[in-house]
Amino acid sequence: MPVVISEKQFNDAHQAFKLHDKKDEGAVSNKELTNLFKSLALHVSDDKLQQWVDEMDEDATGVIRWEKFKILFERKVQEDEDERELRSAFRVLDKNNQGVIDVEDLRWILKSLGDDLNDDEIQDMINETDTDGSGTVDYEEFSALMLG
């Protein structure tokens, strides 16, 4: 579900952006982005950050302007919310609180999603998800399945 980012969150992000805009040019160096996200209590992996820089810094200027950072900020907040919701769903399905869900519960979930999957398609998804063949799915496997 899309996250609604409050005006305060945008203002906080903009203030943080300005603090990291060392030359007061309305832009932050690509190298400074990690610190900028950290200052907003958001963790972005180096690989993800590089992917975003490649996408947003189309002209290879070495900087990201506020308009582009705002897009990245929204994306990161949405990703974090999606992760929270996914973890919450996993905890509900982890009936024994052991960090795994049974593949039969996963089968039920996949049928319930209403994606018109037939039994063979569901079994293929389970086989791809339960990579270690344990008959259970841990959070990493579940996340990979649900987030694609």
From Swiss-Prot:
Boundaries of every EF-hand domain copy: 8-43, 44-79, 81-116, 117-148
GO cellular component annotations of the record: myosin II complex
UniProt xrefs under Pfam families: EF-hand_7
Domain of life: Eukaryota
Database matches in PROSITE patterns: EF_HAND_1, EF_HAND_2
Biological role stated in the UniProt entry: Troponin is the central regulatory protein of striated muscle contraction. Tn consists of three components: Tn-I which is the inhibitor of actomyosin ATPase, Tn-T which contains the binding site for tropomyosin and Tn-C. The binding of calcium to Tn-C abolishes the inhibitory action of Tn on actin filaments.
Comment field (misc): This protein binds one calcium ion.
Record PANTHER family: CALMODULIN LIKE 3 (PTHR23048:SF0), MYOSIN LIGHT CHAIN 1, 3 (PTHR23048)
Protein name: Troponin C
Organism name: Todarodes pacificus
